[in-house]
């Protein structure tokens, strides 16, 4: 936001001052320093301050409020309507994790992240922003469980619909031990962006969802564990966040079977139907 808007406004102000200094530069020697040009402009009563302004042009980012809605939002008549963003920041992340099938705990062994930030103005700051957003997204996808009050799952949270987990005192945010043991962040080289100052790109929020690579790696690890305990493995649902409870229960071993199937079920159903219950079982939350 700061670089995109304030940077372009600053560029507008600088362009105004440069235009005012052009006649002064022509009067002076070609090797005159900026200080000499500024001093000469001052004594010639040239205004050395400027008010810059910038707003995104409508053809780059905006909405046509008078446009009629398309008949089919997924159809070709709606494929290229409007411009939601001035530009896009691209990124990719690959993560390797290890899960403990007995406790549901996990550790992130390695994460590799590559992000297109255009021509970075300050690579150190951009890399720090990427690291922070990645960890924040990783926490959102693995530990930060939201609990809402409702009649069926959490009736003790009143009134119904109230968010119980309203801060880090009631949900787990990532700590130092949650950081990938090997964390590699790279910026793409040679990428231009003509729609921002110095060809830069915003990087504060875009890398957030890259943390989901840890979530999908956990799901792959769970799938591998389930293939050990369950035959004829099929697709399964892992709800966000991938808490230790959900990881443990979805591994589908005999301990899990015993915990979710009572004695009456064991008496009425065969082994295969009992195991199939694991495919649809989904822990509702840690509370």
PLM region descriptions:
Residues 99, 141, 185, 201-225:
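C-terminal substrate/ligand-recognition segments
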Residues 2-4, 119-124, 195-207, 229-233:
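Glycine- and acidic
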Residues 221-244:
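Glycine-rich phosphate/pyrophosphate-binding loops
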Residues 169-200:
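Generic long, charged, amphipathic alpha-helical segments
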Residues 1-134, 145-176, 239-287:
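Cofactor-centric catalytic regions
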Residues 216, 221-228, 250, 254-257:
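Hydrophobic alpha-helical segments
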Residues 117, 144, 191, 224:
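Conserved helix-loop functional segments at active or binding sites
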């Amino acid at each position: 936001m700061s670089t995109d808007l304030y940077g372009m406004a600053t560029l507008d102000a600088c362009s105004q001052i440069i235009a005012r200094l052009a006649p002064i530069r022509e009067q002076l020697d070609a090797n005159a320093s900026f200080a000499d040009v500024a001093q000469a402009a001052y004594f010639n009563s040239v205004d050395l301050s400027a008010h810059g302004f910038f707003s995104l042009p409508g053809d780059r980012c905006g909405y046509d409020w008078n446009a009629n809605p398309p008949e089919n939002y997924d159809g070709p008549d709606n494929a290229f309507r409007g411009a939601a963003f001035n530009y896009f920041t691209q990124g990719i992340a690959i993560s390797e994790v290890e899960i403990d099938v007995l406790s549901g705990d996990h550790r992130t062994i390695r994460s590799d992240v590559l992000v297109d930030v255009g021509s970075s103005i300050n690579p150190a700051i951009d890399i720090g922003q990427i690291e922070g957003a990645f960890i924040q997204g990783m926490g959102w996808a693995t530990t930060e469980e939201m609990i809402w009050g409702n009649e069926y799952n959490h009736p003790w949270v009143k009134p119904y619909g109230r968010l119980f987990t309203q801060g880090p005192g009631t949900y787990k945010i990532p700590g130092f031990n949650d950081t990938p043991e090997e964390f590699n962040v790279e910026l793409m080289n040679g990428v231009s962006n003509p729609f921002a100052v110095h060809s830069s790109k915003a990087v504060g929020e875009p890398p957030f969802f890259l943390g989901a690579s840890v979530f999908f790696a956990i799901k792959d690890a769970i799938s591998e564990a389930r293939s050990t305990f369950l035959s004829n493995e099929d697709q399964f649902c892992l709800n966000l966040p991938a808490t230790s409870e959900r990881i443990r229960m979805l591994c589908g071993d005999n301990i899990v079977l015993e915990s979710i199937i009572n004695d009456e079920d064991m008496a009425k159903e065969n082994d295969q139907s009992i195991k199939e219950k694991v495919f649809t079982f989904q822990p509702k939350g840690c509370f």
